[in-house]
């Protein structure tokens, strides 16, 4: 491979964009590798997870900081619906300051930690707080850095299962791309309603489609990025709300805050945030695969079209959505979880191209150091067990 997204590798390196381009591009290959890896590691995670998931009193807490938190927020509604289990998603940044408001001390808890570096202060503190406060705590750690503090925490502990994502997922660029999608996919495969064997067919179809999209979408995405929008609103319901939050952050990060972003649900936008839509705004709406939920998506789309205030509108949909020029049918899937990944790929490509269009450096959009790849400056305070 001499480059990515029609860019020469040397040009990308000169623009400090090579890592980001490669890490977005490689994702379909990593997803296939992840499925195979989980099959090979089944003897490690299955004896740990199966007894826990069979307990009807178990609460599953998906947690992380920043993008890692959004992976959980994208999956939690889908997991609740498809498995009937009690699944919630909280930021470690919330849990650390007020653990008693988020951790249920009356129930066995499986804490699922998403972490790229595995060294974020809040991630380690949340795990330690869970073990300190919960009478029955278990940990599934989905990490990208095998040498991280979080991965090392699993050693010699029976209540911890640590799984390292495929090689290459520990992004070297500032923004989380491969790491985010691999951790999200691993949780969907391990905690979802299908076995790995049952998930292979829809996963393979999604991987094949995303391999096509990374080739075919680039001209359209590049034109959007060059259009000059200065505001960006991402919209999606249920699991797509979490994905919209991630897409919003990715644009904010890679454009170093030069493009103002916001996320919401299709129904939530009308309750005030719609004021943000003006003639400098790109609105991105992620359509659900479900007929019922998609009615609400379609109503807002039509309303925004009638308003005529947005600079541009783009819809991302499965092939059941009627086509128009501004709605892109990215993948045919009967389940929202398999739309998460092609939608994510589009939003990552758009943020990357927008960074280049603004003459920024995607691999490190903040070279002056005020915002860092691994968070700095956080002091963790000891939490006394007597505090409630």
Task: For the regions a language model picked out, list residue spans one by one.
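Active-site phosphate/pyrophosphate-binding segments
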Residues: 22-29, 34-50, 155-284, 359-388
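Conserved phosphate/anionic-ligand binding catalytic regions in large, soluble enzymes, centered on
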Residues: 17-20, 67-78, 234, 238, ...
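Short, charged, surface-exposed secondary-structure boundary motifs
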Residues: 98-100, 171-176, 270-271, 337-344
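Hydrophobic alpha-helical scaffolding
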Residues: 10, 14, 65, 113-116, ...
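Short, positively charged patches
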Residues: 15-18, 25-27, 45-46, 59, ...
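Glycine-rich phosphate-binding loops that contact phosphosugars or nucleotide phosphates
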Residues: 53-203, 286-331, 350
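Phosphate-moiety recognition in structured ligand-binding domains
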Residues: 1-23, 28-34, 155-159, 198, ...
């Amino acid at each position: 491979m001499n480059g990515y997204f029609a860019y020469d590798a040397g040009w990308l390196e000169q623009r400090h964009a090579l890592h980001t381009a490669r890490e977005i591009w490689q994702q379909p290959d990593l997803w296939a590798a992840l499925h195979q890896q989980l099959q090979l590691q089944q003897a490690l995670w299955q004896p740990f997870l199966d007894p826990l998931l069979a307990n009807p009193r178990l609460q599953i807490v998906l947690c992380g900081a920043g993008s890692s938190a959004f992976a959980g927020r994208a999956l939690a509604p889908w997991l609740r619906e498809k498995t009937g289990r009690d699944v919630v998603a909280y930021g470690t940044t919330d849990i650390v300051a007020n653990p008693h408001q988020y951790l249920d001390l009356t129930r066995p808890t499986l804490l699922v930690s998403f972490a790229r570096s595995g060294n974020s202060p809040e991630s380690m503190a949340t795990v330690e707080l869970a073990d300190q406060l919960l009478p029955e705590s278990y940990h599934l750690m989905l990490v990208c850095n095998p040498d991280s503090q979080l991965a090392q925490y699993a050693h010699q502990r029976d209540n911890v299962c640590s799984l390292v994502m495929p090689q290459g997922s520990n992004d070297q660029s500032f923004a989380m791309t491969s790491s985010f999608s691999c951790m999200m996919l691993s949780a969907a495969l391990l905690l979802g309603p299908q076995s790995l064997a049952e998930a292979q067919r829809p996963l393979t179809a999604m991987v094949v489609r995303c391999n096509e999209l990374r080739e075919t979408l680039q001209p359209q995405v590049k034109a959007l990025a060059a259009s000059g929008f200065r505001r960006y609103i991402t919209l999606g319901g249920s699991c797509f709300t979490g994905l919209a939050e991630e897409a919003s952050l990715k644009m904010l990060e890679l454009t170093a805050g030069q493009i103002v972003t916001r996320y919401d649900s299709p129904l939530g936008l009308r309750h005030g945030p719609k004021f943000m839509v003006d003639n400098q705004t790109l609105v991105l709406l992620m359509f659900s695969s479900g007929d019922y939920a998609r009615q609400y998506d379609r109503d807002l789309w039509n309303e925004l079209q009638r308003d005529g205030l947005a600079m541009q509108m783009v819809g991302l949909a499965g092939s059941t959505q009627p086509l128009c020029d501004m709605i892109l049918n990215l993948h045919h899937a009967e389940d929202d979880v398999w739309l998460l990944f092609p939608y994510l790929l589009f939003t990552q490509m758009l943020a990357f191209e927008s960074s280049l269009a603004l003459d920024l450096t995607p691999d490190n959009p903040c070279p002056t150091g005020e915002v860092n790849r691994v968070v700095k400056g956080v002091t963790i305070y000891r939490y006394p067990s007597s505090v409630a």
